[in-house]
């Protein structure tokens, strides 16, 4: 099974729709038919697919492809699909609207009808990265100082979080912006903006610590991995997990087992979504009609030592306002890559 859960990969996966948190009043009610799920394949010869939360198949990928990014904009859904042989495609409502064997898409947002993508060359003859609008290059990013991981776009205002920055900074509308109060290298970050309000989750700071930065104030977090940050209605939301690591000896080797609680931190107040003897993570959040929907993923991770390998078994849940929803038959047994809510 494709894990897609390593920190540096998560820096490239990240958020659900970039512009689906605004103007909720005219939206229809949410049902299982308009919650769409990008689901990882667990069967040989069958690719990833898009299904409804009820279980109906919307789109089936080819056997040699997998979904890297999934989002919605109004009535439309989009997926960035990668090919194991190289190259990528952008799918809109089941139709290919972009294809390349020379560039790969790191992240994508849809804003006011425009498609924004972070793209880099494939294979990589030079270190280069571009911000594109409707698949046309509009900015060349300063790769030696800043490598992006994830972006947000709000009415043409583009901000990028670093997967790596030489000095503590983020990129916004063509310029690197220093993060007041921080210095040194940063790794694996996530960003959201609301005008002058800027929130950045940082998985590795110069002291190898995790924390989040908001408008010059930095808060460190213990034993935490961040998977998404959001600014909604003036409140900050940090999604991730709080983990513990146990080291034991068995089969004459060193074994490690990681367990974690899926958490959400709202304006500094932590709430546990899911706990247990597994690795749980709050992975992606959408606000729709003033309700919060959160994807929670659960992994069973066996011990690793010189005699054993790691076995991952996934379960996935959608929480609505902190409570798990009842989904279609066997949906929770699937490995959900990400989810989106479609206007019907």
Locations of regions flagged by a protein language model:
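Repeated scaffold domains used in trafficking and secretory/extracellular systems
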Residues: 63-74, 102-112, 145-155, 184-194, ...
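C-terminal motif of bacterial Sec signal peptides marking the signal peptidase cleavage site
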Residues: 14-17
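An edge-strand/N-cap motif at the start of beta-rich repeat modules
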Residues: 23-63
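Blade-level signature of beta-propeller repeat domains, shared across WD40, Kelch, NHL, RCC1
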Residues: 314-344
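Short beta-strand elements that form the blades of beta-propeller/WD-repeat-like
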Residues: 33-43, 76-83, 113-121, 157-163, ...
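A short beta-strand motif characteristic of beta-propeller blades
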Residues: 56-61, 94-100, 136-142, 175-181, ...
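Structural motif
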Residues: 44-50, 85-90, 123-130, 165-169, ...
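Sec-dependent signal peptide recognition
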Residues: 2-8
């Amino acid at each position: 099974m494709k894990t897609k859960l390593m920190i540096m990969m998560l820096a490239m996966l990240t958020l659900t729709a970039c512009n689906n948190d605004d103007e909720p009043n005219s939206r229809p009610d949410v049902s299982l038919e308009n919650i769409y799920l990008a689901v990882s394949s667990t069967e040989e010869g069958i690719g990833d697919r898009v299904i409804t939360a009820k279980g109906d198949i919307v789109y089936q990928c080819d056997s040699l492809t997998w979904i890297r990014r999934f989002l919605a904009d109004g009535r439309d859904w989009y997926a960035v699909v990668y090919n194991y042989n190289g190259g990528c495609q952008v799918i809109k409502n089941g139709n290919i609207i972009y294809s390349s064997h020379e560039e790969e898409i790191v992240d994508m947002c849809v804003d006011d009808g425009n498609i924004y993508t972070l793209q880099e060359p494939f294979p990589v003859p030079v270190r280069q990265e571009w911000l594109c609008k409707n698949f046309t290059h509009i900015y060349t990013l300063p790769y030696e100082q800043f490598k992006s991981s994830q972006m947000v776009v709000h009415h043409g205002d583009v901000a990028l979080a670093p997967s790596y920055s030489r000095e503590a900074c983020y990129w916004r509308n063509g310029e690197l912006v220093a993060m007041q109060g921080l210095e040194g290298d940063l790794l694996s970050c996530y960003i959201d903006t609301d005008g002058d309000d800027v929130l950045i989750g940082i998985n590795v700071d110069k002291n190898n610590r995790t924390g989040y930065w908001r408008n010059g104030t930095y808060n460190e977090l213990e034993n935490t991995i961040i998977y998404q940050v959001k600014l909604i209605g003036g409140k900050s939301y940090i999604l991730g997990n709080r983990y513990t690591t146990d080291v034991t000896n068995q089969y004459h080797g060193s074994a490690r087992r990681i367990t974690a609680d899926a958490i959400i931190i709202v304006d500094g107040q932590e709430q546990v979504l899911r706990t247990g003897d597994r690795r749980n993570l709050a992975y992606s959040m959408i606000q729709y009609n003033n309700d919060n929907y959160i994807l929670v993923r659960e992994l069973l991770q066996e011990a690793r030592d010189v005699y054993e390998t790691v076995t991952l078994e996934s379960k996935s849940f959608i929480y609505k306002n902190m409570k798990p929803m009842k989904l279609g038959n066997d949906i929770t047994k699937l490995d959900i890559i990400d989810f989106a809510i479609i206007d019907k």
